[in-house]
Curated annotation (Swiss-Prot):
InterPro entries registered for this protein in UniProt: Ribosomal_bL36 (IPR000473), Ribosomal_bL36_sp (IPR035977)
Keyword tags: Ribonucleoprotein, Ribosomal protein
Family the UniProt entry places it in: Belongs to the bacterial ribosomal protein bL36 family.
Gene Ontology molecular function terms on file: structural constituent of ribosome
Protein name per its UniProtKB record: Large ribosomal subunit protein bL36
Gene Ontology biological-process annotations: translation
Gene Ontology CC: one annotated term: ribonucleoprotein complex
Gene name tied to this protein: rpmJ
Organism expressing this protein natively: Geobacter metallireducens (strain ATCC 53774 / DSM 7210 / GS-15)
PROSITE patterns according to UniProt: RIBOSOMAL_L36 (PS00828)
Superkingdom of the organism of origin: Bacteria
């Protein structure tokens, strides 16, 4: 899990999801999982 100001897709499997006003990137690769904050 990375906390970043700008979340971007890193690979093709990354998905951008908005959950309770928090923008997240979910991916099979744990290194690619991000949260905006």
């Amino acid at each position: 899990m990375k906390v970043r100001a700008s979340v971007k897709k890193i690979c093709d499997k990354c998905k951008i999801i908005k959950r309770k006003g928090i923008v997240r990137v979910i991916c099979e690769t744990p290194k690619h999982t991000q949260r905006q904050g």
